[in-house]
Structures are given as C-alpha cells and as structure tokens.
UniProtKB/Swiss-Prot annotation:
Gene3D superfamilies: 3.30.70.240, Elongation factor 4, C-terminal domain, Elongation Factor G (Translational Gtpase), domain 3, P-loop containing nucleotide triphosphate hydrolases, Translation factors
Broad enzyme group: hydrolase
Compartments in which it is found: Mitochondrion inner membrane
Entry superkingdom: Eukaryota
Identification of the protein by name: Translation factor GUF1 homolog 1, mitochondrial
Keyword Chloroplast belongs to the record: no
Cited Pfam families: EFG_C, GTP_EFTU, LepA_C
Length: 748
C-alpha cells in the first residue's frame, strides 16, 4: 500500500534494528577505497584532519567509517567454477542473509548493488554498466523496472555466509515489485541520497518494510557528491525526525568511489537477522527401516519437514531480461534438457524444507502439481545447484505452465509426510495482489493479427503479473485487448517491452481509470459495479449514481517551486490542498486530494517540469466518491466511433469533445461531400466541426447572362451532393494515424 502521506505521522521512536553494532563502525566516514572485500587487510584509520583519499571534499571527513576488525576472505565457491555450484551443500539458516535495497528514484540503488557485486567478486572490474538493469527499456530510460536478485558468497573470519541481494525499482508505478521483494527478504537497506535527503518514495518504502516487521538499515549514498556537511546533517536529521532511526545506525557509502562497501557488508552480516526456517527432506515419502522409538528414527522424523516456498517472480526465456545460463568454457557442449524457451522459471524464497530437481510441488491456490526440472541460484546468471534449502533464494524451472494456473505470490509446497498433514500447510502471509488503476485498449498495428498480440501479451504477463487482460472488439479498430496497469509509466514500459522483445507494434487508446456505479435500488453494502465506455449506463437506464477514484498525492519540493505547482494543481487538475508543512529551509511537503484521472493525465510530468526535476510525488490507494460523470461519444458522418468514447466530468465534456473533433478535422482528408464531426453527451451535441467538401466551379464557363443561369447550376450541384451523401453514409475510413491523433487530444 502506498503511504506517501505518512510523513505527517509522529516520529517512530524505537530501535528498529535488533542487532547492535559499534557506533564508531557506523558513524565514521572513510575517505579511502584501498581495501577490498576479498582482501584480508583492512584500511588504516585516517586522522580527522587528513584530507587525502579519493574524495575531494575535505568537509566530508567529519563522517568516517572505521573498518571492522573482522576480516573477509575470498568467496567460495568461485564464481567461475560450475562444478562447485552443482555440488553446493546446504547453508545453515544462521549463515544466510536476505535483504532488499529500497530507495527513492535515482538515489543509487542499482549503482550500490553493482558496487557490492564487484567488491565481492561476483562481477569483474572489466564489466561496465549497471548489471542489474537487464532489460533494454531499463538501459534506455536509465531506471530500474524489474527487481533483480543475486546470491553472494562471503567468507568472514573463516565462516562462509550466503547473502541474497534484491535490487528494487524506485518509481511509484512499480511498488508491486518492491512489495514482492520485501516479502522475500528479512531486512531492507533504506538508501537516502546524502544531497537530496528524504523523499516521498523513501517514506513509502520505509513504512512498507516496517509493516512487514523487517530490520531496516539506513544508508546515506552518493557521499562523494556532497560539498559540505550541511546536506549530510540535514539528511541525518530528516531520518531521525521522519523514521525514528538513530544517527548511530546510519551507514555511509559512495558506490561510485567503491568506499564504505566493506563496512556495509559487515553490517549486513551482523545486523540482518538470519531466516527462521526448518531444514527438511521435502521429497522423502517413507522412513528408513529404523526401530520404532529409537533416537535415529526420532531425528529422521524431525527432518521430515514439507517444503513451503514463496513464489515472488517468474519469467520465460523469451522475456527474462537477458538472464541466461552462462556459456560453457573450453568449447564444451552442455545440454541440460531444461533450456526450452517455453519452460517457466520461478524465483522462490524457501521458507521451510528442501527443494531439489524432480521434486513434485503443488501450487497452493490452483492445486496444480508440477515437477521441478531444475533448481539453482543466480550468481549472477542461472547456476544449477543440488538443492535449495530453508532460507535460500533461488530459481526453479517447471515445464510450461499456463498463466491462469498460477500467480506471483503463490505458496509452493510438497505432499504431506507422515508427520505433517495437508491442513498443516499454511500459505506464506504478508503478500497480496494489487488492483490496476489505469486501463487502456491495445490494438494490433495495421496488417497484424490479434492472435500474435495476444500470445505476446500472455508471455509478457508471466513477467508482469500486475497487468490484467480482457478481450475488446471495436468496429473501427477490430479486435484488441483491454489491459490494466499500475500507472502511466507502467503502461508505457509494457508497450515498449512488447516492441523490443516481441516486435509487436500496437495502437494504444487513451488511458482511463476505473470508474464505478451503483445500481438503482441496491443497498449500500452491495459491491459497486465497474463502469467503462462499453458498460456505460445512464441514470434512466438503471444507474443510481457514479463514483470516481480520488487519491491523496504527497509532493516534496523546493519552496521556490511551491506556488507554481500549487497553482497548476488547483487550476488544471482539480486538486484540493489538504495541508502543507515546511520540512526545512529549502523544502516543503504538500498534500492534495485529486482525482486519479487527472493524476494519470500528466500531473507528475507537470510537477517535474515546474520543479526542474527536484520534486517527488507519491500517492496512496484510491478512494471512490460520488461524481457527476457523463460519456462523450464521437460521431463521424453520423456513425459512432467507439474507440474515441470517453468518460469525464460533465463540466469538461464540451472542451474534451471540442479537442477531439478539431483533431479529426485537421487530419481527415476532404472528399466530394461534407463530413460532419460531432461530440455528443446522450442526445445533446456539445461540439461540432465539418470537413468541407471539394467544390467544382460549375459556373466557370458562364461569363454573361442572367443570374438565374448560375443559380440553376448551383442548385443542380447541391442536389447531386445530397444524393452522393446518401449513398456514402458511413463510408469514411479512419486510419490508425488519424485515430491516434484524436486519442492524443483526449489526454491533453
């Protein structure tokens, strides 16, 4: 649940991290990057007045990290030895750490994740770019869209630890990715840009982790970018005031300079709690022939814990974002038999038990049974292993499973053993499906078939579980699909992935939010009915009232930009200011009550433009309120074009209708007859334009004589055009380019 307005709550004064760590280990900023996590040497402590090192600003030396006295050795097994992974033994839960990296947009999550992977030897120094951004659209846009995980092996004081890192998106449209990642984690690294401080999504992620009872490790990032102590002090104060996290708990890092990474890894091992799972032999159906009541039999029964795992992501080889099994070395040809593009790859967190290849697992909701073809970890590509045990995060490969037979958030389990019955299997709690807030029609490009588009969408939905799909049929555009998304950016990214990964060019109708209505004579307790342009009901047709979704939008911006943003919110986007709070000398927090339709229409883009990119926005779940809504229909030569119908407030119907018919007039080709363009609300015309016909000068050869000769020619021409118009009713063809231009006018 989005909780951007939670900044107004009183500070939560409590110690969120149960494990303690030396304050001098946390609060001292080290301006050197000389030590490496694979080295047994630690960096020497720098004096407070020393200004040497890779960071140029001497004022940063107020915040230093003194390296831990614990030492870290080389990771094992080596990341380039495939045989070591195939024989990977189970890790005890006490030596496993699962954590997610969460933060506001562009606060350094992916850069820090890559720095951790490079410091631990998972990535080599020769590899460039952000490794966890695998999708083409992620690299083009420069943002994280899909959460990515990677297993890291670290040896500390002779003990080997398995760290499972999950890098998450920061944009509000991808909160579902963050929610799933936190459900599979035991802790969250809460990153805050040292220069920008607390932002709206920072608080949303903080409360999301807090609601799940996760340990929170606050981390200030981009320490190399600040030029004085003032922004760091302000960020620390914001953390204390807004979250209750103590200053001495804060870690300082510079992923760009590879500084503070080793101290961060030490803190993860010391402060992140190990998973609480039971090891077991999940696929064991019969006990060995041991004497009843013997200690050996009792010990074996204790190990017979059935498998219980959380499925928190899935993909196929066709839409896996470049995640593949590493190529064999030395020209070896390896064929595991599990490389079929139609196979389903699921990312799972093992709660209890053990998962091995050939284990038959059951999906809790659908009761579908499937055999695991392969299990393994991501390090950083797919690495098959002998087993996944309690507390581990890895992948499992199934033969092709249809999308309706499972959903992300599903609990996987094995058949009951002698000790555990079916009713003892409890689904993994704390995970819920989200409802889409923006809907749009997707139609295949001219010359393409709906079957190919439907297959591409179904394959991509395996990796995008928040997208909903329903069939559509439009006389002007043909067969299509109505898809539901979590926001405008989510819709744009999905459209780009269809083109990049499946080559599908589509025409997208204007996005609409989910309106609802209450039937006449129904009780207040009865559920509301969904309202779309295809299921529209007027009041005289049985609708008692219409309801529109409203959200509470929280904006954090600089004080000099507040007036411009406030003016636009109230004037163009039907916003109602709820409250405003001054955070510090430079920033303010303001909350608006606003229709979700106006928010999706481009409010965030306007806020970013007016604030020069320095504002952040978050909004919560929609709440439905009664509204005066109408449906605007567009008629071209008296034929209704359903693709251009739109639901809007009654007060905005004339302006929206005017924009649509004006766009059609400027793009339609003139013909031999007039083409009337009308926008109607019910039976009332609210806007009209006419595409004038070509007119032949029938009096060109008449140079003299009475005027009645010209009038006769004009009357004959008029009668002929009337006969032609009667024969060509509905014959106007609208190309997709014309419809796309008219649809764009709706969103202005």
């Amino acid at each position: 649940m989005r909780v951007g307005c939670c900044l107004l709550l009183k500070p939560i004064r409590q110690r969120l991290c149960t494990a303690s760590i030396s304050s001098r280990h946390i609060m001292r900023w080290c301006a050197t990057s000389s030590s490496n996590i694979n080295s047994t040497e630690t960096a020497a402590k720098m004096p407070d007045d020393d200004v040497s090192g890779s960071l140029s600003a001497p004022s940063l030396l107020k915040y230093k990290i003194e390296p831990s006295t614990a030492t870290m050795g080389a990771p094992r097994p080596p990341h380039d030895d495939d045989r070591a992974f195939c024989t990977l033994a189970s890790f005890p839960p006490s030596h496993i750490r699962n954590f997610a990296v969460v933060a506001h947009v562009d606060h350094g999550k992916t850069t820090l994740s890559d720095a951790i992977l490079r410091r631990t030897g998972v990535l080599s120094g020769s590899q460039v770019g952000t490794y966890t951004d695998r999708l083409l659209v992620e690299r083009e846009r420069g943002i994280t869209i899909k959460a990515q995980t990677c297993s890291i092996f670290v040896v500390r004081d002779g003990e080997e630890f398995l760290l499972n890192l999950i890098d998450t998106p920061g944009h509000v449209d991808f909160q579902y990715e963050v929610s799933r990642s936190l459900s599979a984690s035991d802790a969250a690294l809460l990153l805050v840009d040292a220069a920008q401080g607390i932002e709206a999504q920072t608080m949303a992620h903080f409360h999301m982790a807090l609601d799940r009872g996760l340990t929170i490790l606050p981390v200030l990032t981009k320490m190399d970018a600040v030029l004085s102590d003032a922004p760091v002090d302000r960020a620390l104060q914001d953390l204390e005031d807004s979250t209750g996290l103590l200053r001495r708990e804060v870690l300082f890092t510079s992923a760009k300079e590879q500084v503070g990474i080793e101290a961060l890894l030490h803190a993860i091992i010391e402060r992140v709690p190990p998973p609480t799972g039971l090891l077991g032999l999940s696929d064991l159906q019969q006990l060995p022939p041991l004497l009843p009541g013997s200690a050996e039999r009792a010990a074996m029964e204790e190990k017979m814990v059935p498998l219980r795992a959380l499925l928190f992501d899935s993909w196929t080889s066709e839409c896996g974002g470049g995640l593949r099994r590493p190529a064999p070395r030395g020209g070896e040809k390896v064929n595991s038999g599990n490389d079929n593009d139609s196979n389903l790859i699921c990312l799972v967190r093992i709660i209890d038990g053990t998962l091995t290849a050939k284990t038959v697992v059951t999906f809790y909701q659908s009761q579908r049974r499937c055999e695991a073809l392969e299990v393994g970890i991501i390090h950083p590509e797919l690495r098959p292993t002998a087993a996944l045990t309690a507390g581990m995060v890895g992948y499992v490969v199934f033969s092709r499973v249809r999308g309706e037979e499972f959903f992300v958030g599903e609990t996987l389990y094995t058949l009951p053993t002698r000790k555990f019955a079916r009713e003892d299997i409890v689904p993994v709690p704390g995970f819920r499906r989200v409802q889409p807030v923006v809907f749009a029609g997707f139609y295949p490009d001219e010359g393409e078939y709906i079957t190919q588009l439907r297959e591409a969408v179904e394959k991509l939905r395996v990796n995008e579980p928040a997208v909903t799909m329903e069939p559509l049929d439009c006389p002007a555009l043909g067969s299509g699909l109505q898809l539901g998304f979590l926001g405008m950016l989510h819709m744009q990214v999905f459209q780009e992935r269809l083109l990049a990964e499946f080559g599908q060019r589509v025409l997208v109708t204007p996005p609409l939010v989910q309106y609802k209505y209450r039937e006449a004579g129904s009780d207040e307790e009865e559920p509301l009915k969904p309202l779309t342009v295809h299921t529209w009901k007027w009041i005289h047709e049985g609708a008692a009232c219409y309801l529109e979704p409203y959200v509470t939008a929280t904006i954090i911006t600089r004080r000099e930009h507040f007036q411009a943003i406030d003016s636009e919110a109230l004037r163009r986007f039907r916003g109602e200011q709820l409250d405003m709070r001054v955070l510090d000398d430079a920033r303010v927090l303001v909350r608006y009550k606003m229709p979700l339709a106006d928010l999706a229409r481009g409010f965030f883009a306007v806020v970013k433009s007016l604030s020069h990119g320095y504002a952040s926005l978050d909004y919560g779940d929609p709440v439905y309120e009664e509204a005066d809504l109408v449906k605007v229909d567009v008629l071209v030569q008296k034929s209704r074009i359903s693709a251009l119908s739109v639901i809007c407030p009654r007060s905005e119907a004339p302006s929206i209708g005017k924009r649509i018919v004006s766009s059609l007039k400027s793009n339609l080709t003139r013909t031999a007859v007039d083409i009337p363009l009308q926008a109607m609300v019910g039976s009332k015309i609210v806007a009209r334009e006419t595409v004038k016909a070509y007119r032949k000068d029938v009096t060109a050869k008449i140079h003299a004589g009475d005027i009645s000769r010209k009038q006769k020619k004009w009357n004959d021409q008029k009668k002929g055009k009337e006969r032609m118009a009667r024969r060509t009713v509905g014959a106007v063809t609208l190309d997709q380019s014309i419809l796309a231009a008219a649809m764009g006018a709706i969103s202005l």
